């Protein structure tokens, strides 16, 4: 039987994950910096897992196994976020300051707000993104969390950062077109990669600030 302490912590974490940041901050005005980081990591993990599961389901359903490797090595799989100076892994991320990592994470998140806003109109059969109508809200929620962390680290006066002028294309609604399938496949691949980066950056920041045993990832 699960001990009362860990069980209570798990239930609290789940409850906070279901709340938007405005409610979290309102309910816990004195939330510590470690609490803000913990919630941001939790939300990023949830979105990354959702993106990974969706990519796998889309791939399994629409992309023949023999074509997957070749497609992933074409321009279709190129993510324009790779053109910004973002660390590609944990070791590179550790060379950046927390504010640099937060700004990069913000750029990655904001580049997807447009494409994901009407995602439920694309996958209307609920084959993938069963909760697609909430993906945009979850992404906005994470954006608010990152902005909250930036305000904390910048003493409430965030500086103007780099503006990502380009965003990803919208998902194609014509699922019977091979070109549309390839485009959506590439977008889902990029979404998964960008959420993995964001989760990695947030975990690196949280671990090096608070030195937790779970830092080995």
Swiss-Prot record:
Q: Alphabetically, which GO biological process terms does the record hold?
A: animal organ development; cell population proliferation; growth hormone receptor signaling pathway; insulin secretion; negative regulation of apoptotic process; negative regulation of fatty acid biosynthetic process; negative regulation of gene expression; negative regulation of plasminogen activation
> In the record, what terms sit under GO molecular function?
growth factor activity; growth hormone receptor binding; hormone activity; metal ion binding
Which key words tag this protein in UniProt? Disulfide bond, Hormone, Metal-binding, Phosphoprotein, Secreted, Signal, Zinc
Q: Which cysteines are joined by disulfide bonds?
A: 79-190, 207-215
Q: Which Pfam families match?
A: Hormone_1
Carrying Phosphoserine, the residues are 132
Which residues of the sequence carry a binding annotation for Zn(2+)? 46, 199
Listed InterPro entries: 4_helix_cytokine-like_core, Somatotropin, Somatotropin/Prolactin, Somatotropin_CS
Places the protein is found: Secreted
Signal peptide boundaries: 1-26
| Summary of the function given for this chain in its UniProt record | Plays an important role in growth control. Its major role in stimulating body growth is to stimulate the liver and other tissues to secrete IGF1. It stimulates both the differentiation and proliferation of myoblasts. It also stimulates amino acid uptake and protein synthesis in muscle and other tissues.
Which family does the record claim for this protein?
Belongs to the somatotropin/prolactin family.
What name does this protein carry? Somatotropin
Q: Which organism is it from?
A: Bos taurus
Q: What is the lineage of its organism?
A: Eukaryota, Metazoa, Chordata, Craniata, Vertebrata
